[in-house]
């Protein structure tokens, strides 16, 4: 009889254990000397990779519990307005255990793309998503400007990701051709973690150990730039979302970022339906606009993973790939902890199928 799991996170833990078949398939070193060389070089490479990731991260605790509660009530209002259908179509993107709310600027990604792969993401035409709510400016952005984390006028894109327990977002790099750096995120409702360099595998679903594990506390601000933003993927694993968690992601779009044109809006409508003010859309219809069912956490296909089923392996551009010791070649565990980051500055195996990641 097959094992029964009460939660997807238990299934992931079970699947991450090596099966005898997988162990037999692993390549054995040709000699004891080769084995010693590999054992000696891999930890050094892991430490170097983790050091590079750390160099691109700043993290600080900025919002008090009372301030968090005030912002969280505003996030609940956003959810309520979306449930009532008060936002534009492309403002809201729903998936099991994860809803996204785009403000200021929205863009195509994942299963919405006609052509998939890095560099294919496009901004929506101006006005296709709702403006950034006033409370985001007043309660969040203003504080970041006052603390000189970002310059005034930097943010023109705000995304709220609302996760339920067991939710996740697969490994990705925020599209470099769409967004300037840094990438700023503020966490609410509960503690979680951000993982760098993980591999996601599907059928069965499993997630590798990260190159670097970064605890993320409620009320904390995380700033990614340099290596951490551009040269390695980041993700949120299902096992790291134990309670509801929301994150406000604040970014600036590039002036030269490609944008969909209204006249080319697509193909899912028949010509006879394009009368009057009806507009075509170049996007595929969204998979679902319904809320996740209560038992969604126990299903094997979760969140954005269902959008990744047919994706090719998406790593970084060729010129940025490393032939050895890259985050996409090894499964690693970080021994670092968030307490090494302060407010004051910069100190602040083998899967069955290819890794499925995407720029996001």
Curated annotation (Swiss-Prot):
Keywords: Dioxygenase, Disulfide bond, Iron, Metal-binding, Nucleus, Oxidoreductase. Residues 1-53, 261-360 are annotated as: Disordered. Coiled coil: none annotated. Residues 264-280 have a biased composition (Polar residues). GO terms for biological process: membraneless organelle assembly; mRNA destabilization; mRNA export from nucleus; mRNA processing; regulation of mRNA export from nucleus; regulation of mRNA processing; regulation of translation; response to hypoxia. The active site is at residue 107. The keyword Disulfide bond applies. Its cofactor is Fe(2+). Signal peptide: none annotated. One of its GO terms (cellular component) is nuclear speck. It catalyses: an N(6)-methyladenosine in mRNA + 2-oxoglutarate + O2 = an adenosine in mRNA + formaldehyde + succinate + CO2. Binds 1 Fe(2+) ion per subunit. It is found in: Nucleus speckle. Residues 32-48 have a biased composition (Acidic residues). Belongs to the alkB family. The C-terminal disordered region undergoes liquid-liquid phase separation (LLPS) for the formation of paraspeckle membraneless compartment. Monomer. This is RNA demethylase ALKBH5. It comes from Xenopus laevis (African clawed frog).
